[in-house]
Amino acid sequence: MLAASQITFLQVDLGRWDRSPGGDAIVVPLWTDVRPLRGAAGLLDWRLNGRLSQLLREGRLEGAAGEKLLFFTTRVPWRRVLTIGVGEISTFSEDAFRASMNTVLDSFHGLGIKSVGMALPGRDMERITPERALRVLLSVAEQQAEQNPGNALSELTVIDTPPAIKAMTETVRAIERSLGH
């Protein structure tokens, strides 16, 4: 499992992103039925001069569940961008969240991606609580690390709003206490 020292939090704010150490990849979720893009995806799109919106308009990207696109960038502190399609808002559930986390972590296999900034799917539209999202993510990451030890993340920066970050920080502390750390 990722230790508390390996998890940091970052607000959805370009100024804070620019001052962050960045890493190997930033992950943002895309919905099929939310336009314009919101949250971290919308902010990233703005920083990328509308590249995500253009891909959506051209039909090269839809936001369908399980869809993913990985590309390089120099416009944010992360070297790569991974978009993950999460489908329609109305069909999003904890199972969909879990599936999207598996898709994200599977995508890193063999690419040497160890340090990730991630806007958790469903958080931008309040479809999953911050606490539950973090717990499910950590569970999926632990399962993936057991299956592919060489592919485990070494650093995770969760990107969200200040209230969600506060809730997730408390969740990390509670997990650490329960593990006796």
Regions found by a protein language model. Name each.
Residues 1-181:
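Glycine-/small-residue-enriched capping loops at alpha/beta junctions
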